[in-house]
Amino acid sequence: MRYTSAAAALLASAVIGGLGITPPAAHAQAGPSQVRAAWIKTCTDKKNDTTYPCGHWQLITRDGGKLTVKDASTTEIDGKGRRLDDAGLFAISGDGRVIAYERAGDHRIVVRQAAGGPVKVLAASLVPKRYGTSPLSLHLSPQGDRLLVDSTDEKERVPTKVVTIATGKIVELPAKDSMNGFSTDGGEVLAQRFNRDNTLTLIAYRTDGTSVRRTPSQVVANSAMTALAADGKTVAVIISGDEEAKKVPRLRIYDLETGDLSAGVDLALKAGQTPYLAQWSADGRLTVLVQTGDEGSTAVVREFTVDTETGAATQTDKYSISKTRYAFRVAGE
Amino acid sequence: MKIRIAVAIAAGLAALVAAPQAAQAMPHDHHDGIRYASVKGCTVKGEQRPCGEWRLMMHSGEKGSLPDAETIAREANGKSSHTQVAPIAVSGNGRRVAYFTKSGRLAVRTMGGGVKVFAKDALPRVAQYDVTFQLSDDGGRLATVFATNKAVKTRIFDTATGALLGSTPGGQTLLGFSADGGELLTEVSADESVTDLIAYSESGEQLYRATPPQIVAANSPSALAADGRTTANVVMGGAKSQLVLYDMQSDQIIAKRKVKLPAGDLNMIDWTGDQQVTLHLVQYPDGKANKMTIVQIDTETGAVKVRDHYSLLKDSYVFAACGG
């Protein structure tokens, strides 16, 4: 999401205020303060030919620049504090202005403006002592004002936590649910639950603790990804393309309250270009990201704005990520 | 009727042929039918392979064999595959068995009756291990499914005459015949990452095609009722197990019945009456013979009745149980 108007700049300031951390004045405007993605380098252990993350997390800014996040941990740790061969936790808000990560040294989760400035250290309880940061993943809301700390511990002991950054307030969501992400305004979290009867239920959790849930048809349950709009009920459903069958990815719109499902449209993308991230913008348009380039080759990320009525896709951004990467996270992921 | 690599069985066809049973009035008089067919396994040159003849284990406790049946599958060119098991299937009522003869022909034998050897060109020339047989509950119909890389149509035969009745598209998973053998049910991966169910007439005409709800698609396999449109499937979940009835024509779940099932993994599901679904449940206890429990579910009430249970021959390499 880009802020180009004066009003948007004001909005951005408001959000920064809401974050409760002081932005450096020089970075309070659009431009270099927005980041597209973060990545971390790979190194190879020649003894056993395994790879591991090394160096610092790097930010790729909207204007093509680079920033290094020196205090972000390179790797995760387990419950005994041992470093693992998985990249440290990292997330970027949908608007590219806020980052959250696992801090080197104490492995606490922190949040700050992408452009720089002081960090806000979040509650120590977000990292379960039993497991360290290893089962966790971080997701920032589109405006960076809320953080989702999802846990994939096998025993489903650790609840998902939603942190309102300005206040530090933590809301817990059921450990057995897996998280799809925030709604556009950050007001809801879309989750899914795998039921004992092998079906999957979609659930939108609201901030007030209430929720809307429905067990959808196969096409929604088997989709590549879902994205919740600001209204907390409209779900964009992206269906995988199939290169072998020469079928392009499709889009359907699902209403979580009524169960209504649109007939769907083909997206004007190639069969192999199944988006791996979809986000509704505040004005009701849908943005999708397509990534190409396997491990060991340069990753190219393309951003498209999709017309939900026709499936027409307009490329709005394109950037690459080094082939030396171990892992990367894009804004809004 | 599916061949399960893991366990096996044997039976004595010869014994069956010698002792024809007179009473055939009851379609499900299992007492004179085959419970299952099994072949032993042994290790030759370090490789596991089937050994000896197919053994037919009868409800009466008798044991027969199928001396004219191939146990080791042949390649498309007729040479032995040495290690692969040749296909076999037992009808739901246990009265008929389909197999390849030693001379490579398709055959269906009736317990206490004769054997129908099919025409040489009844089946396409493919490796026998790429062929799966399924018989209808009464054994009157045979479907031959080909798991070749290139999709080959499934062929449907009348087992009394050997006549080819029709074919259904290749590349689909055949789930089985309807209760009366008049239709077939298949499952296929469709566009948009969903699984569809399709009902065909025995002549290969598509009757219904539906994208069922998750609770059906995610708890495969389904079985088709005699009406050719109602399916049954089971959600296996211990105390929370349920039978799900689904109408392909209206795309509606008709009923969900809580069912109390004995232990075991689902091996087969078949309609065996207008209000009856039969399950084969198998257990694989470590170091012991596999156990089969067969239950009948009343589709109206969900009441479960154990029809039969037995331990499979411990030396079974592969077995094929009757379906109904």
Model region roles, listed by residue range:
Chain A
Residues 28-94, 319-333:
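Extracytoplasmic low-complexity, Pro/Thr/Ser/Ala/Gly-rich segments
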Residues 29-35, 89-98, 102-103, 137-146, ...:
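Blade-terminus and WD-like Trp-Asp/Gly-His loop motifs, strongest in beta-propeller folds
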